[in-house]
Amino acid sequence: MGYLDDEVKRLQGIISNIEGRVQALESRQLGGNQKKTAEEIRMILIGPPGAGKGTQAPKIKEKFNCCHLATGDMLRSQVAKKTTLGREAKKIMDAGGLVSDDIVIGMIKEELDNNKECKGGFILDGFPRTVPQAEGLDKMLRERSQSLQHAVELKIDDQLLVSRITGRLVHPASGRSYHTTFNPPKVHMTDDITGEPLIQRSDDNAEALKKRLATYHKQTAPVVDYYRKTGIWQAIDAAQAPGQVWKSLQAIFDGDKAKAKKAGSGLLSKLTPSS
């Protein structure tokens, strides 16, 4: 048994050295001595307007130090910066057309490549809205040797949404959202973080919302089915208080950590002799 014990220790040492070299290479890949975070998130938030994506996304961003890519905001930013893709998108929008999936996916890829916040992963909000978009996103991520971890759907009854949205307040620059009744800002009509003014969107009224919800349900059902088949879809009851929704999200993330810990210890456990 002495020989076997020595051999196990020798192999464990080799594995430990390999793990150290992998971490060093990952650090160099990130550019310098920055250590790659053990926690990284790659997820999509699915949910109708008013489900709470704008409330939960900043919390996820803070937890993982990742980027929040709300496609509408990203599109406006690219147009304002006059990037190549932004100029192309503006030309299409000025002509009354819809920006192509390839352009939007190109913008997401550009953010993942160049936005330092995306080193900790990303939250996609507002995309994909169709199955071809979901397939295009998966293809782009595969080319980066990545894949989505979660497609989390915030589910809520339409009637409750109407009451939620008609009192919604938004901080345009960040996408943070508040509610006059359910989640009011600390100072009236003022963003808690920046102190900048909040707005109420012109389409946040009952009739406009019902039309938006009908469109949302028609578009989103096939996308939800797509991610359900891949095994990464999970649903959360968004009718709960925001704090409870956050606890449900944390339970999903804690499940990731448990899986990673189990996978990481798998090889060493095989080399460790049973008592």
From Swiss-Prot:
Residues 70-99 are annotated as: NMP. It is an enzyme of class 2 (transferase). Its main location: cytoplasm. One of its GO terms (cellular component) is cytosol. GO terms for molecular function: adenylate kinase activity; AMP binding; ATP binding; DNA replication origin binding. The keyword Mitochondrion applies. Pfam families: ADK (PF00406), ADK_lid (PF05191). Coiled coil: none annotated. Residues 167-204 are annotated as: LID. It catalyses: AMP + ATP = 2 ADP. Keywords: ATP-binding, Cytoplasm, Kinase, Mitochondrion, Nucleotide-binding, Transferase. Consists of three domains, a large central CORE domain and two small peripheral domains, NMPbind and LID, which undergo movements during catalysis. The LID domain closes over the site of phosphoryl transfer upon ATP binding. Assembling and dissambling the active center during each catalytic cycle provides an effective means to prevent ATP hydrolysis. Belongs to the adenylate kinase family. AK2 subfamily. This is Adenylate kinase. The gene is ADK1.
